[in-house]
Curated annotation (Swiss-Prot):
Mitochondrion recorded as keyword: no
Composition skew (Basic and acidic residues), residue ranges: 294-308
Organism: Rhodospirillum rubrum (strain ATCC 11170 / ATH 1.1.1 / DSM 467 / LMG 4362 / NCIMB 8255 / S1)
Gene3D superfamilies according to UniProt: Aldolase class I
Keywords tagged on the record: 4Fe-4S, Cytoplasm, Iron, Iron-sulfur, Metal-binding, S-adenosyl-L-methionine, Transferase
Name by which UniProt lists this protein: Lipoyl synthase
Annotated Radical SAM core domain residues: 65-282
GO cellular component: cytoplasm
Residues holding [4Fe-4S] cluster 1: 53, 58, 64, 293
Length: 314
């Protein structure tokens, strides 16, 4: 008997296909076919771990896995949200794997990581949204790999107790990332389970809990936003004290996902970067293939140096 194929997005199955424009020549990526990539994949399977690299169909997976870098996705591979842009499976999640913090730390040690990025699916089914599990993962990695810097990319903990966010921040990540993803006008169609100003307030609260932690947020472009809306998001992020901004091109995972409205040119990305630096961000990454965790290890070193340089000029 053949296994029933997994339907990753049951809520999208009945939708008509949404063809996107053809990708331009500046969007070219390599498949994850290197020996190093095979080793990373095998390690993840052996430790029962998931990566956002695979689950979200990241275009940079070939490059990152060749460098033996991966972004760990905790709390399972099934999300309780159904964002229009995301390739992660939607449905009813299973139990939380209590062994995951240990397996995660084992993998960080085995890969010799100097910087690790930990993200998760949304777990609206959990009382704390998974905050306690984030705390345990951070603590375990810190214990097993004390020289490894830790970056978290969290969900919004919407409708969860105030202490949920504090639980994550107080575990002591070096970088706290929460992506706004798009401009507020597009939230009802692109990110219907979230609220723009809630996410913005979350980033602001992180700095209140720990003023020393680096905060980071990103958006996708090519979804139908205007230039003026992108600049307003930059201003909103700076008002919330965000240190590091990432801007990348939205790429459609399947024909059932929202279509690409347009492909933003490399020159436009450069223009956004120049404007953002002028608004006071410590760091900006803006290019067609920029993703939240792409080159996160190198970016963390640059981020620390940027803060030191800024302090020296005051």
């Amino acid at each position: 008997m053949m296994d029933t194929p997994i339907i990753r997005h049951p809520e999208k199955v009945r939708r008509p296909d949404n063809p996107s424009p053809r990708k331009p020549e500046w969007i070219r990526v390599r498949a994850p076919v290197s020996h190093e990539a095979a080793e990373v994949r095998q390690l993840m399977r052996s430790k029962n771990l998931f990566t956002v690299c695979e689950e979200a169909a990241c275009p940079n997976i070939g490059e990152c896995w060749k460098r033996r870098h991966a972004t760990f996705m905790i709390l399972g591979d099934i999300c309780t949200r159904a964002c229009a842009f995301c390739n992660v499976r939607t449905g009813k999640p299973g139990h939380v794997d209590d062994q995951e913090p240990v397996n995660l730390a084992d993998s960080v040690v085995a890969m010799g990581l100097k910087h690790v990025v930990i993200t998760s699916v949304d777990r609206d089914d959990l009382a704390d949204g998974g905050a306690g599990h984030f705390h345990r993962c951070i603590t375990e990695v810190r214990s097993r790999a004390p020289s490894c810097s830790i970056e978290v990319l969290t969900p919004d903990f919407r409708d969860k107790p105030q202490g949920a966010l504090a639980r994550v921040v107080e575990a002591g990540p070096d970088v706290f990332n929460h992506n706004l993803e798009t401009v507020p006008r597009l939230y009802p169609t692109i990110r219907p389970g979230a609220r723009y100003f809630h996410s913005l307030k979350l980033l602001d609260r992180v700095k209140t809990i720990d003023p020393g932690v680096f905060t980071k947020s990103g958006i996708m472009v090519g979804l139908g936003e205007t230039r003026e809306e992108v600049l307003q998001v930059m201003d909103d992020m700076r008002s919330a004290g965000v240190d590091f901004l990432t801007i990348g091109q939205y790429l459609q995972p399947t024909l059932k996902h929202v279509a690409v409205d347009r492909f933003v040119t490399p020159d436009e990305f450069k223009d956004y970067a120049d404007i953002a630096r002028g608004k006071g961000f410590l760091m900006v990454a803006s290019s067609p293939l920029t993703r939240s965790s792409h080159h996160a290890d190198r970016d963390f070193e640059d981020l620390r140096k940027a803060r030191q340089d800024a302090a020296a000029t005051k």
